[in-house]
């Protein structure tokens, strides 16, 4: 492993030192056993190089150290002045991780992949202390196939483009409670998406019988043998009852008076 250059922070001075693989092993041996040491270092090296995200560094033009000490430490490291377009870095007043102070000072003094490597080491040490697995690749996921086997290729909807059953249903948009959601299927092989199949009802209206014939292959309509409801009497016209007066257009001839 390459040398890791560290700048250890203190209240009055800042010293620079180089930490080799031997020094890191000696430091880690204080927290973990030798049986877990090599696996932890190998895991931290792999994950730090794979998932390294370059942090956006703030320049000196918009970051200034505060000239005052905060009365109450509320855990906020940065404060922003919107009026003057400046940001201020607050110095922490409460020391944390006293048990891992040496490793935390090493993290503060490094940058880049070396800093990420030490952060993964600190995370792994804390997990080992608590007796939990730090490597997510070794954690077995819960299988829900006994409850619902949605992504089974045997029952999946085939893709109309490549005829593959390696498809996944996705809910694109949710709507009101009385409307169906917008669902699309995505094919993992040809990277195409398509609409789910729908049941089509072939309507054949007959004027004489007013019957609707559904597609027999999809569904069957059970006959309605219940007696018809009694015919209700036709309601009286409001005009005949004199409730509404007949109106005429001004271009029409006036009605004749009853003699």
UniProtKB/Swiss-Prot annotation:
<comment type="subunit">
    <text>The DNA-dependent RNA polymerase (vRNAP) consists of eight subunits encoded by early viral genes and termed according to their apparent molecular masses Rpo147, Rpo132, Rpo35, Rpo30, Rpo22, Rpo19, Rpo18, and Rpo7. The same holoenzyme, with the addition of the transcription-specificity factor RAP94, is used for early gene expression.</text>
</comment>
<feature type="binding site">
    <location>
        <position position="159"/>
    </location>
    <ligand>
        <name>Zn(2+)</name>
    </ligand>
</feature>
<dbReference type="InterPro" id="IPR001222">
    <property type="entry name" value="Znf_TFIIS"/>
</dbReference>
<keyword id="KW-0862">Zinc</keyword>
<dbReference type="GO" id="GO:0008270">
    <property type="term" value="F:zinc ion binding"/>
</dbReference>
<dbReference type="GO" id="GO:0003677">
    <property type="term" value="F:DNA binding"/>
</dbReference>
<dbReference type="GO" id="GO:0000428">
    <property type="term" value="C:DNA-directed RNA polymerase complex"/>
</dbReference>
<dbReference type="GO" id="GO:0030430">
    <property type="term" value="C:host cell cytoplasm"/>
</dbReference>
<feature type="zinc finger region" description="TFIIS-type">
    <location>
        <begin position="155"/>
        <end position="195"/>
    </location>
</feature>
<feature type="compositionally biased region" description="Pro residues">
    <location>
        <begin position="226"/>
        <end position="236"/>
    </location>
</feature>
<comment type="similarity">
    <text>Belongs to the poxviridae DNA-directed RNA polymerase 30 kDa subunit family.</text>
</comment>
<feature type="binding site">
    <location>
        <position position="162"/>
    </location>
    <ligand>
        <name>Zn(2+)</name>
    </ligand>
</feature>
<feature type="region of interest" description="Disordered">
    <location>
        <begin position="220"/>
        <end position="259"/>
    </location>
</feature>
<dbReference type="GO" id="GO:0044423">
    <property type="term" value="C:virion component"/>
</dbReference>
<keyword id="KW-1035">Host cytoplasm</keyword>
<keyword id="KW-0804">Transcription</keyword>
<dbReference type="GO" id="GO:0003899">
    <property type="term" value="F:DNA-directed RNA polymerase activity"/>
</dbReference>
<feature type="binding site">
    <location>
        <position position="187"/>
    </location>
    <ligand>
        <name>Zn(2+)</name>
    </ligand>
</feature>
<dbReference type="GO" id="GO:0039695">
    <property type="term" value="P:DNA-templated viral transcription"/>
</dbReference>
<dbReference type="GO" id="GO:0006351">
    <property type="term" value="P:DNA-templated transcription"/>
</dbReference>
<keyword id="KW-0240">DNA-directed RNA polymerase</keyword>
<comment type="function">
    <text>Part of the DNA-dependent RNA polymerase which catalyzes the transcription of viral DNA into RNA using the four ribonucleoside triphosphates as substrates. Responsible for the transcription of early, intermediate and late genes. DNA-dependent RNA polymerase associates with the early transcription factor (ETF), itself composed of OPG118 and OPG134, thereby allowing the early genes transcription. Late transcription, and probably also intermediate transcription, require newly synthesized RNA polymerase.</text>
</comment>
<protein>
    <recommendedName>
        <fullName>DNA-directed RNA polymerase 30 kDa polypeptide</fullName>
        <ecNumber>2.7.7.6</ecNumber>
    </recommendedName>
</protein>
<keyword id="KW-0479">Metal-binding</keyword>
<dbReference type="Pfam" id="PF01096">
    <property type="entry name" value="Zn_ribbon_TFIIS"/>
</dbReference>
<keyword id="KW-0808">Transferase</keyword>
<keyword id="KW-0548">Nucleotidyltransferase</keyword>
<keyword id="KW-0244">Early protein</keyword>
<dbReference type="Pfam" id="PF12410">
    <property type="entry name" value="rpo30_N"/>
</dbReference>
<dbReference type="InterPro" id="IPR024394">
    <property type="entry name" value="RNA_pol_30_chordopoxvir-type_N"/>
</dbReference>
<feature type="binding site">
    <location>
        <position position="190"/>
    </location>
    <ligand>
        <name>Zn(2+)</name>
    </ligand>
</feature>
<keyword id="KW-0946">Virion</keyword>
<keyword id="KW-0863">Zinc-finger</keyword>
<dbReference type="InterPro" id="IPR009162">
    <property type="entry name" value="RNA_pol_30_chordopoxvir-type"/>
</dbReference>
């Amino acid at each position: 492993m390459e040398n890791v250059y560290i700048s250890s922070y203190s209240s009055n001075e800042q010293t620079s030192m180089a930490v080799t693989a031997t020094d890191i092993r000696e430091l880690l041996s204080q927290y973990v056993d030798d049986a877990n040491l090599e696996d932890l270092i190998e895991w931290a090296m792999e994950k730090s190089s794979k998932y390294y995200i370059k942090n956006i560094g703030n320049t000196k033009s918009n970051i200034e150290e505060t000239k005052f000490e905060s009365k109450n430490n509320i855990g906020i490291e940065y404060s922003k002045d919107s009026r003057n377009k400046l940001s201020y870095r607050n110095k922490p007043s409460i020391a944390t991780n006293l048990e891992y102070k040496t490793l935390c000072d090493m993290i503060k003094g490094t940058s880049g992949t070396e800093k990420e490597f030490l952060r993964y080491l600190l995370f792994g040490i804390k997990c080992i202390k608590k007796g939990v697995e730090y490597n997510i690749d070794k954690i077995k996921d819960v299988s829900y196939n006994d409850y619902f086997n949605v992504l089974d290729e045997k029952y999946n909807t085939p893709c109309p483009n490549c005829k593959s059953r390696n498809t996944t249903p996705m809910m694109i948009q949710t709507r009101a409670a009385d409307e169906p959601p917008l669902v699309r299927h995505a094919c993992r092989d040809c990277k195409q998406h398509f609409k789910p199949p729908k049941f089509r009802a072939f309507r054949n209206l007959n004027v004489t019988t007013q019957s609707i014939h559904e597609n027999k292959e999809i569904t069957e309509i059970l006959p309605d043998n219940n007696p018809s409801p009694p015919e209700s009497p036709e309601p009286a016209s409001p005009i005949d009852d004199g409730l509404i007066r007949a109106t005429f257009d001004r271009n029409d001839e006036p009605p004749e008076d009853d003699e």
